Amino acid sequence: MDEYKHIETCVGRYIAAQYLHAVEVGIGRNPDAARIVSDAGKLLCSTDVRQMPVPEDITFFVDDVFSPDISRYRKADVIYAIRPAIEMIPPMIELAQKVDCDLVVCHLGFESWGDGGEKIDCGVILHRYYRGQNPSNRVD
């Protein structure tokens, strides 16, 4: 399996198995993880700072985590991102805290922010930087 697609597959399967209402931040031009989560019926939406060519059946919004539209994230039990720029981590943590949901990040290589958060091995290493305090919507 192509390593690039392996990462998205692992992340998508993990998010779909562990959560009910997910938002992907920074979808870019790679909707593979969002596709897996969406096919499981668990993707609320995907976002990026610019308009992106995502499949029509994946709900997409232009949004910037540095000044997010909180309404896009309110129902989420997880916000996740694949290979975000490291400077995006603090505002994503703040966003997850505001809406009280988990924040799960798959970094590029061995990057991490701060203490690296809670590490999760789902075939690739994920970092849970914030765990929502009201897990009523969480599968696990």
Show the residue positions of the predicted features.
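Conserved SAM-binding motif I beta-strand of class I
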Residues: 43-48
